[in-house]
Amino acid sequence: PGKMLLVDTVQGRVIDDQELKEEYAARQPYGEWLNSQLVNLSDLKIPNQKVPQYSREECQRLQKAFGYSYEEVKTSILNMAMNGSEGIGAMGIDAPLAVLSEQHQSLFGYFKQLFAQVTNPPIDAIREKIVTSTTVYVGEEGNLLEQKEENCHVLKINDPILTDTDLLKIRNMKVDGFRVAEISTTYYKNSSLEKAIDYLFIQVDRAIREGMNILILSDRGVDEYHIAIPSLLATSAVHQHLVRTKRRTEVAMILETGEPREVHHFATLLGYGASAINPYLAHESIKQLID
């Protein structure tokens, strides 16, 4: 599994996986490029700054603001924190579709897989190392059709789910070729969502004009006067805006959001354009459960 065979009708022979990969690997000095250009998140120094902390009351207030339920905290978040995996449950769901529900629904609930995909045993990055990876590379992608050393100047992150310390390191990184901008996805409660998204585009365009190539979309700052654009909507909107303006490969998008707390939430955010996610409220909820 995960290996290739090439039937070369010109040479009249079958080229195996090893020979095929060696041929392509030798076309450029990729190893030298990576050694000189690749930056590892794990190698960055932790800045002398503190990660924001919340009291129990503040945490509960934010949980209400982002729509956390008691069951999500006690079953989904707690189970993932204790076991490092999603809880096992029966296939299927008997809850009403979000579009038919009369109750307020998270935007994540409107997105479903087209089919039930099940493998036995489960496929993951541990059991299937040869064909899967959780590593992500953050930064300007450059010309995908041109092989050059500058394209290797990216930040390597071993897991797309960032700790608060990971994000702190990225936010304060001082490495040539990387410029980080933080953009708020909150807006005043008396304003409209449409205006908030338009202003989000203005901030993104300004950051790119100033040479930024890593954007941190953050919804910290939610309070009685400010609400957050749904993280999935903000991610998708910025992604599509950059595609329309033909600048998508110039920047990477990282989320600092209190909204996601289930595997499905993270999957949709990554699928709709996020490179990495810092679920700060889920992390804070775990701390509160421990305390």
Which stretches of residues belong to each language-model region?
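Glycine-rich phosphate/ribose-binding loops and adjacent secondary-structure elements
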Residues: 6, 178-291
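Extended, highly charged accessory segments
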Residues: 9, 13-186, 192-199, 205, ...
